[in-house]
Amino acid sequence: MKTFIHLLSVLILSVVLYACNNAHFLKEENYRNQVTEDFEQKKQALPHGDLFTVFSNPDLSVYEQEALMFLYAYMPIGDVTDYSGDYYLENVRLSGQTRTEMPWGDQIPDELFRHFVLPIRVNNENLDDSRRVFYGELKDRVKHLSMKDAILEVNHWCHEKVVYRPSDARTSSPLASVKTAYGRCGEESTFTVAALRSVGIPARQVYTPRWAHTDDNHAWVEAWADGQWYFFGACEPEPVLNLGWFNAPASRGMLMHTKVFGRYTGPEEIMLETPNYTEINVIDNYAPTAKATVTVTDTEGHPVSGAKVEFKIYNYAEFYTVATKYTDAEGKAFLTAGKGDMLVWASRDGKFGYAKLSFGKEDALKLSLDKKEGESYTLPMDIVPPVEGANLPEVTPEQRAENDHRMAQEDSIRNAYVATMMTDEQAKEWVNGLYGNILQPETMKDKLAAFLVASRGNHQTLKDFLSAIRKEKKHISWEEMRGMWLLENISAKDLRDVTLDVLNDHLKNTSDGEKTDTDLVKRALLNPRIANEMLTPYKKVLYDAISEAVLKSAPVDAAHDAKALIEWCRKEIKIDNELNSQQIPVSPMGVWKSRVADEKSRDIFFVAAARSIGIPAWIDEVTGKVQYASDGLSPQDVNFETSQSTQPRTGMLKASYTPIRSLSDPKYYSHFTISKFKNGTFQLLNYDEGDVDMGGGATWSNLLKNGVKLDEGYYMMVTGTRLASGAVLSNTTFFTIEPDKTTTVDLVMRESKDQVQ
């Protein structure tokens, strides 16, 4: 009898396993066919590099094959080239595990699981092994809870790990945020979404790209439970859902949206569909809204189809694009937004037109493409944001007291980990122990100690790097000096997540630059940092590969080699911006392997390749132009369209300013910005604190009073006075910069006689 029962159990288990292995991940046939078609197109677009070998695994079940197919069909280019198929297979299996091990696994609709649990990517972060790590830490903590309580509990766990602190624009991976113990709101929300997905709870990052009433932005989290979406502040636990410090400002928001992985057909308004994601509008969850339709015509009144329509919010002294749509056959595009003012900008074939649109007051706007490059004029505009109307859920005093108590406990847990990081005293002691009195001046010791402190939980990587290059005991070697310069030139965030193989590759495989310590060599040759990409090792491999495949010899003449590299990039790298619609940088090795990139990743690749063969190269931080230097010549602009490099033709811009009360020296981003015309729209010039040697960033007095060089072209300057109500008095000036000439404009800060500024 026991034998029979055992055999029956084995048979039942076999049947279950067979059924599971042959169950569809994509259960709806029409959707499965669409994904299959998209996947085949992706394979055709990326024919090089053996990027799809995981599908040759004979052990893949039908479920696993379809889940992988869904991921690969909609991944950005870099996710295909820079991570292995085995990595994605592990994550498919881990996500499937939550459906059987978590009590809510069978409650989640397939569509929500597909788009909000399975995907690893949340936004533009570096991918890591957080799903496996987080599941191991969280599963026993939440498996006996309801879904809503589990969401709250995961957020408490996140607060144990990470708190808010501003940082640069590159988004840390979830595990890097844990190692650092802090992150900006975009990193906190990326981390929290990853944590929720790790235990099988559908989650998404929601963000307002710009507030309308104040110069800032914010990102938070929505999670799904029991049939609906709830919001909360990432790493900011509250006693209940739908509560955060941002309830009030969100009620004044004009747009909240999220990027959903793949083709998504949920109930929300679709703002944009790309080969990678579907962007949806969730503003209705937070604020009163209104819908408006924009009709774009030519100068004769005929509708223009395919026109680009940008919806812009005034913020940080620019009109920032928060939504982009394209007109249909009738020349129409629509948007649902909070009840305030936006600037609507339409363009097609180099022509453009614009007007203010007041959502809630106007439900239609007609725009004529009647503007063209070269016209000089000034346009004042009053911008009014939505009014506040927050709706706060009830919290009892007991709930608040319990939540405060838990947050204090979580602070102590996190602070205990932070205490394992190096203090200034410990770092200085370690540096002294390594170098004694040999390293001079003392300021260099202080710098190294500061790097160790700034590296937070990554300090062992820096210690291993510095210890390994400390070979000469009686003096500082050339390699050691270069190692110190390398650490000087990477960002503070890089110090927190850089790996030893990256540091070693860039130290050991960078040309000596004739053993000079010029700023150019440090900044544009030795430096691993190019733009906002994750740092990777590539110099040794690219030096060998480019020498053989591009130059046909070892690098000899920088000017000749640069031209050969430009020509190779033009001919051999296929540009496909749509396949990388978020512009998440593809690694230099990923571009080399696939021969496919978006323009931004192509630019990063060129700089990486040039540095690998000893040519100083960079992407200009203000204009975004790719440049290089050779043979002591002035910087050369790279033009991949013609394979030519040229010296930029520049003119001078000066601005006069008559001070208004309480504002003697307007600041860039706070009071004014400058943008350059390109392809029917204007692109911001990114001046920042590092560009002007005045300590406080770019201002009228140190940028425009005596003049600043700009490339020839058509520009606009936006100024704005923010009133206490959140409204803005803006002024936009259009002007042209001609080569070797000075253009003078007025920087006008408008004032209100009636309202508080």
Describe these PLM feature segments.
Residues 27-180, 216, 399-401, 407-594:
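Secondary-structure boundary elements
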Residues 350-372, 722-753:
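Structured interaction patches on ligand/partner-binding surfaces of diverse proteins
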Residues 291, 299-318, 339-341, 561, ...:
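Short, ordered, surface-exposed loop/turn motifs in non-cytosolic proteins
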Residues 370-430, 658-660, 746-757:
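Compositionally biased low-complexity segments at domain edges in trafficked proteins
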Residues 140-146, 150-156, 165-175, 180-272, ...:
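Hydrophobic/aromatic-rich core segments of domains that either
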Residues 315-336, 680-704:
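Short, acidic Ser/Thr/Gly-rich low-complexity loop/linker segments typical of extracellular
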Residues 18-19:
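C-terminal motif of bacterial Sec signal peptides marking the signal peptidase cleavage site
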Residues 290-301, 331, 651-663, 754-757:
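A short, amphipathic beta-strand motif
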